[in-house]
Amino acid sequence: MKLPHEFYQLPFRFDVGQLAKEIEQFTESDWVTHHEGFQGNSAIPLISVNGEFNNDFKGPMLPTAALAKSPYIKQILASFGEVLSRSRLMRLAPGAQVPLHSDINYHWYKRVRVHIPITTTEQVQFFCHDKQVHMGAGECWIFDSWKLHKVENNSDQYRVHLVVDLAGSSQFWRTVFQHSRSIADDQSTTLNSQFVGFNPDSPATLITEQFNAPVIMPVAEVEYLTNELLAEVKHNPENLVADVNAFSLLIADFVADWRMLWLQYECTKAGWPHYHALREQTMIKALLCAKSLQLTHSGSAVKAFEQLVIVACMNVELSEQLATRKQAITSPKNSPESANLASVKSASATSTSTSIIPKTAAENNARTIAAPPSRNSPCPCGSGERYKACHGKVN
């Protein structure tokens, strides 16, 4: 995700000793090697598609067996009070590194990765664009994954981080921009951090993503993503004007033709061959006319276009699964599916109420005072005012 600055330290601290105890239970066979073969990189999935040991991005995110036996880690994840995507323990061997790369696919464009170091040393350095930091054990960090970044472990010890991907609510981003410390801020000042310890008597409830990829991407999102890419391409002074103009025309044609197909077929199967043909033809043209174009700090524009838009705009393999889950959500109140939905809502309320993300006074009031049937009714707080002029007042 793009951020105004390369790094932000969030105002939370966690119990490193308890975290270390929980990762000690895992054996070497539990650690899965990196899916792209990065030497010295391994991980243990904690939240994944269908709760399985995979590297998938699309589908319902569920806790894995590894998370089920890690109560403090589960409490930490739940403490954010956010809708969670993928989570894992990420390990970097002594002397190893995470190679220089940028996260340009659809999943990470609007999701940030939260890092909580568990075992680390000063010799572990995280680089992003032209900045670098050491993330201390028990701290909480996010970074701009759209920019090129890498990690070096120049120590003789394993580095292990707990990470979780999330899109972030307004409360989360308010915490980032109002209560956190960016790499541009004075690093000599003390960050006022909240300690989140382990409570063995407090069960944790997670809220996880259920819908994270469209069968066919709506026109508005296609247009938004392509405009974002195009703006960055135009902003890079090293790109040739002729190539930028050719890419601009290609994007405009693609969006216009996608809109025509959407108006005719929306997500129905009859349109699938036409959507596929359009994205295939567009990608071929992009490779011919725009292969030299570069984003500002993130590498190839054509590669980003492919990963962010072309690959992501059509996921027909999810159609039956999504239809079944949507039907369950809209089923009658007395059905088993409705009971499951009620439990999800209950879980959401429970998790949000214990969130470490600060709430505004208005949000706290809204949770304390139940709304009456009509906004013109007397406010339940007993003030004598109408609800709309008291606790229901819209600022």
Report the location of each language-model feature.
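Short beta-strand His + acidic residue motifs that chelate non-heme Fe in jelly-roll/DSBH
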Residues: 100-101, 124-126, 143-144, 148-155
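Charged, amphipathic alpha-helical linkers/stalks
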Residues: 163-240
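Acidic/negatively charged segments and metal-coordination signatures
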Residues: 324-395
